[in-house]
UniProtKB/Swiss-Prot annotation:
NCBIfam families: Ac_CoA_lig_AcsA, PRK00174.1. Its EC number is 6.2.1.1. It comes from Phycomyces blakesleeanus (strain ATCC 8743b / DSM 1359 / FGSC 10004 / NBRC 33097 / NRRL 1555). ATP binds at residues 401-403, 425-430, 516, 531, 542. InterPro entries: Ac_CoA_lig, ACAS_N, AMP-bd_C, AMP-bd_C_sf, AMP-binding_CS, AMP-dep_synth/lig_dom, ANL_N_sf. It comes from the Eukaryota. Belongs to the ATP-dependent AMP-binding enzyme family. The gene is facA. This is Acetyl-coenzyme A synthetase. GO terms for cellular component: cytosol. It is an enzyme of class 6 (ligase).
Length: 672
C-alpha cells in the first residue's frame, strides 16, 4: 500500500518508493546514496560540519594547482561569503585536461544538430585541442585575465569551446541567450563593457535559420558608445552576412593560425568564472557573478548525487546554454566529472514530436533533464509518439524550471520512465548556481509536485513574510530562505555588490532570500509555491497565483494555466486566468463556470477568478517559461508597455490574446 499525503485538500498525493530496479538490479550500478538513512546522515554532516564535509568533497571532485586551507569564510550578514581560500585551480583544466590525459578517446560531447542526422562526437582529446586554440585566439584579440567576453551563439559545440577557452585564460564569460533581441544583447554588452563578442553567422532551430550575426550588428550599430573592438564569427550555415572591416573576424581563419597548446591560468577559488544576466527583469541589467571553486564543486556534486552519475553514463540536459541550467548541467557539471554530455540544437517537436524520445534511444541516454512545459506539451500531443521507441537505458528523469504538476509528473514517470526510473523534481535558481532541493535517485521516496528534501549544505527555513520569524510547524506556507552559505551560491551582482546585498541578503538578515514561497509537509518535504511577489491582493486576501493555477490544472480538461492580477476599483485587484485545454477537449458551454467552482472548492470563494479566458496557448519564452508579466499588462490594458516580445517562442500569440481579452470584456455574458 502506497502512502498518501494531503496537500491543499488533496488527499490522494501518492508517495512513490525508490524504483526497485535502481537498487536491486544487475543492469543498474549501485547508487552513490542508496538509502534515506544514508542521505540524512550525509546531510546532517553537511550542515553541522560544513568545513569538514565540503573540504573533503572539494578534494575528491576537483583538481587544485594549489591546495586550499580555509574552507569557508564570511557570512550572509556581512555579505562577504567566500570558499576555499588560498586554493587555486582552473575550471577548463578540471573540465577537459585531466580527462583528456587519462582517456583522450572518451566522448566528451555528443552534438545532435537541428536535423536528426546531424550528429558530431567530440572526444576529450579533441576538445582540449580546440579549447587551447580558442584560448590563444582570445589572447590574440587582447583578452586577458579578468576581462569580460560576451558569447551570443547557438547550441553548437563551439559555444562550449568558447566558454571553456574563457575559463582557461581567466576571462569572465557572459553568455547571452541567442534568442534575445538586439536591445537586450546591447544592454548586457554595455553593462559588462566587453571588448570582444563571439557569435555565428546564423543559428538553426526547428528547421529555421536564426540571424545571430545580424542581431549582433544591430545591437552594436544602435549604440555607438559601446566598448566592442572585435566580433569573432563562427560559420554555422555558410549564409552571407554583413561584415564590418577591422572589427569582424572569422572564427575558422583565426583558429587555423592558433597553437594547440595554452597553459591554463591558475585562478583563485574566489576569482570570477562567469556572469549570467537574469532574464525578464526591467531596468538596469543584473549580472549574477559566480566564482570558480565553489560553483564548480556545486555543479559537480549535484550531477554526481542528484543525477547519480556513473562512469560511462550518457547525460542529456535539454536546456539552452544561454540559461543557468545549460551552464551548470550541459557544460560545467558533466564535464567536471568527465561525463559524456549531450548538446541538443533543435526543438522537442522537430521534425516530429518523437524527437526527444528518438534522441534517448539513439544515444542510449541514462539521465534526461527537461522542463515541465516541454513535458506537458509533449503529453498533449499524445502517447503515440512514444510507441516502439526503446528508452530502457534511462535511469533518472529530471525536471527543472518550475514545479511540475502532478499529472505531468505521472505521465513523465509512467510513459517515459515506465515506472522504472527515478524522477527528480529539482528546485534552484540562477543565484544558487546549482540544485538546492531535490530527491536523490537511490534514496528519496518522491511525491509528485514536491521537490522533496534539501541537498547537501542547504539548511532551508520558512519565514513569516511580515515578522521574519521562522515557521517551524508543518503545513505552513512561508518565505523560503537559506540559513547557511553554500559553495556554489553567487557572490555578487557585477559591479554592484550593494544591489546583491539589498536583493538577497537584506530582506531577512542572516538568511539568503530566495524570493519564493514554500510549504513543508509532515515528512519535511518542500513544496515550492512560486514567487512571493506573484501575489494578488483581493479585498485584503493575499492569494498566491501558483495555488490558483494548481487548482485550475487539477481539472481534467486543463493542460496549463496562468493567473495574474488586474486592477479593480472595489477590491483592489481581481483575478484573471488564462487556461489552455488538453488535445481533443472541446470548449463546452459553462466550462468557465465549472473551473470557477473548482477554484472556489479548492481554495475558497475569495479566490474565484473574475475572468477565465480559454486560449490556444500562452506567451512563452523559447525555454518554455510563461511570461505572466505580458499577461498582466494585457489584462490591465497596458498594451503599449509590453516591452520586448521578440524572445517569445511565438510573438504573434500576444495580439491574439489582446483581441480576445478586449472582445470578451465588452460582451455582457463574458463571466458566469
Amino acid at each position: 500500500m502506497l502512502d498518501k499525503t494531503t496537500i491543499d485538500g488533496q488527499e490522494d498525493i501518492v508517495t512513490h518508493p525508490v524504483p526497485k530496479r535502481l537498487l536491486n538490479s544487475a543492469e543498474c550500478p549501485t547508487p552513490h546514496v542508496n538509502s534515506l538513512e544514508q542521505y540524512k546522515s550525509m546531510w546532517k554532516e553537511s550542515v553541522e560540519q560544513p568545513e569538514k564535509f565540503f573540504g573533503n568533497l572539494g578534494r575528491e571532485l576537483l583538481s587544485w594547482s594549489k591546495p586550499f586551507e580555509t574552507v569557508q569564510y564570511g557570512s550572509f550578514e556581512a555579505g562577504d561569503v567566500a570558499w576555499f581560500l588560498e586554493g587555486e585551480l582552473n575550471a577548463s583544466y578540471n573540465c577537459v585536461d585531466r580527462h583528456a590525459f587519462k582517456n583522450p578517446d572518451k566522448i566528451a560531447i555528443i552534438h545532435e544538430g537541428d536535423e536528426p542526422d546531424q550528429v558530431r562526437r567530440i572526444t576529450y582529446g579533441e576538445l582540449l585541442r580546440e579549447v587551447c586554440r580558442m584560448a590563444n585566439v582570445l589572447k590574440g584579440l587582447g583578452v586577458r585575465k579578468g576581462d569580460p567576453v560576451a558569447i551570443y551563439m547557438p547550441m553548437i559545440p563551439e559555444t562550449i569551446v568558447a566558454i571553456l577557452a574563457c575559463a582557461r585564460i581567466g576571462a569572465i564569460h557572459s553568455v547571452v541567450f541567442a534568442g534575445f533581441s538586439a536591445e537586450i544583447l546591447r544592454d548586457r554588452v554595455v553593462d559588462c563593457a566587453t571588448r570582444v563578442v563571439l557569435t555565428s553567422d546564423e543559428g538553426r532551430r526547428g528547421g529555421k535559420n536564426i540571424a545571430t550575426k545580424c542581431i549582433v550588428d544591430e545591437a552594436l550599430r544602435d549604440y555607438e558608445n559601446h566598448s566592442v573592438e572585435h566580433v569573432l564569427v563562427f560559420r554555422r550555415t555558410g549564409s552571407p552576412v554583413p561584415w564590418v572591416q577591422g572589427r569582424d573576424v572569422w572564427w575558422h581563419e583565426e583558429m587555423a593560425k592558433a597553437r594547440t597548446f595554452c597553459s591554463p591560468e591558475p585562478m583563485s577559488a574566489e576569482d570570477p568564472l562567469f556572469l549570467l544576466y537574469t532574464s525578464g527583469s526591467t531596468g538596469t541589467p543584473k549580472g549574477i557573478l559566480h566564482t570558480t571553486g565553489g560553483y564548480l564543486l556545486g555543479v559537480a556534486a549535484t550531477v554526481k548525487y542528484i543525477f547519480d552519475y556513473q562512469e560511462n553514463d550518457i547525460y542529456a540536459c535539454m536546456a539552452d546554454i544561454g540559461w543557468v541550467t545549460g551552464h551548470s548541467y550541459i557544460v560545467y557539471g558533466p564535464l567536471t566529472l568527465g561525463a559524456t554530455t549531450v548538446l541538443f540544437e533543435s526543438t522537442p517537436t522537430y521534425p516530429n514530436p518523437s524527437r526527444f524520445w528518438q534522441l534517448i534511444e539513439k544515444h542510449k541516454i541514462t539521465q534526461f533533464y527537461t522542463a515541465p512545459t516541454a513535458i506537458r506539451a509533449l503529453q498533449r500531443l499524445g502517447d503515440q509518439w512514444l510507441d516502439n521507441i526503446d528508452m530502457s537505458s534511462l535511469r533518472v528523469l529530471g525536471s527543472v524550471g518550475e514545479p511540475i504538476n502532478r499529472e505531468a509528473w505521472d505521465w513523465y514517470n509512467e510513459k517515459v520512465g515506465k515506472g522504472r526510473c527515478a524522477v527528480v523534481d529539482t528546485y534552484w535558481q540562477t543565484e544558487t548556481g546549482s540544485i538546492i532541493v531535490s530527491p536523490l535517485p537511490g534514496a528519496t521516496p518522491t511525491k509528485p509536485g514536491s521537490a522533496t528534501l534539501p541537498f547537501f549544505g542547504i539548511d532551508p527555513v520558512l519565514l513569516d513574510p511580515t515578522t521574519g520569524k521562522e515557521l517551524t510547524a508543518t503545513g505552513q506556507t512561508g518565505v523560503l530562505a537559506i540559513r547557511k552559505p553554500r559553495p556554489s551560491m553567487a557572490r555578487s551582482v557585477y559591479n554592484n555588490h550593494s544591489r546583491f546585498v539589498e536583493t538577497y541578503l537584506k530582506p531577512y538578515p542572516g538568511y539568503y532570500f530566495t524570493g519564493d514561497g514554500a510549504l513543508r509537509d509532515d515528512d519535511g518535504y518542500i513544496w515550492i509555491r512560486g514567487r512571493v511577489d506573484d501575489v494578488i491582493n483581493v479585498s485584503g486576501h493575499r492569494l498566491s497565483t501558483s495555488e490558483i493555477e494548481s487548482a485550475l490544472v487539477n481539472h481534467e480538461a486543463v493542460a496549463e494555466s496562468a493567473v495574474v492580477g488586474a486592477h479593480d476599483d472595489l477590491t483592489g485587484q481581481c483575478i484573471h486566468a488564462f487556461v489552455s485545454l488538453k488535445p481533443h477537449i472541446q470548449i463546452a458551454d459553462g466550462l468557465e463556470k465549472v473551473l470557477t467552482l473548482q477554484v472556489r472548492k479548492t481554495i475558497g470563494p475569495f479566490a474565484a477568478p473574475r475572468r477565465i479566458y480559454i486560449v490556444s496557448d500562452h506567451p512563452k519564452t523559447r525555454s518554455g517559461k510563461i511570461m505572466r508579466r505580458i499577461l498582466r499588462k494585457i489584462v490591465n490594458g497596458e498594451h503599449d508597455q509590453l516591452g520586448d516580445i521578440s524572445t517569445l517562442a511565438d510573438p504573434s500569440i500576444v495580439a491574439v490574446l489582446i483581441n480576445k481579452v478586449q472582445r470578451l470584456n465588452t460582451e455582457a455574458n463574458i463571466y458566469i
